[in-house]
Amino acid sequence: MKKTPTLLDLYEAIKPKYTIFCDMDGVLVDFDKGYEDLTSKSTSHADSQDRDGFWNLFNNSLKEKGISEYQYWADLDWQPGGQELWNYIKPYNPYILTAPTYNPESREGKRDWVQRLDGMKNIYFRPAKFKSDLSGKNKILIDDREDTINRWNAAGGIGILHTSAPNTIEQLKQLGL
């Protein structure tokens, strides 16, 4: 005699195989262009400085131009390929996992930017080195920072180093998504 499926059985049959976390800056949002437009320096040039120098230039440029940190983050452009990637992962109900700055306005600006994503509200804020706290079996992180991906993988998750939307989408397809 065949067993009648319970609600739990039905849920197990339809629940998603993976949980997807997607970074914002450098994946969906063009932080590099925004930084260069703000500071007149490329992020690769600014990265050659120490971390404090990078962010001091950012903060000083905001003050000089009269731009709030909220406005900076809320108004960033899409990363090239960002909309394509978002449209691909959207059916899987992804979470945004992004690093805030020390200024609380960055959280509010990023939260408002995320509203472009069809009212999506699933957003987590973690410094890059703590993103792996959310890692685990069947949890995917799409991020453009190799060190973050390495920590994610070491914590048991599946990290996808984002270099372009087509490359990331291909890696997701290899996972059956």
Q: Predicted regions: what is each one?
A:
Residues 97-139, 146-150:
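Substrate-recognition "cap/lid" segment bordering the active-site pocket of phosphatases
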Residues 11-65, 154, 164:
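Active-site neighborhood of HAD-like aspartate-dependent phosphohydrolases
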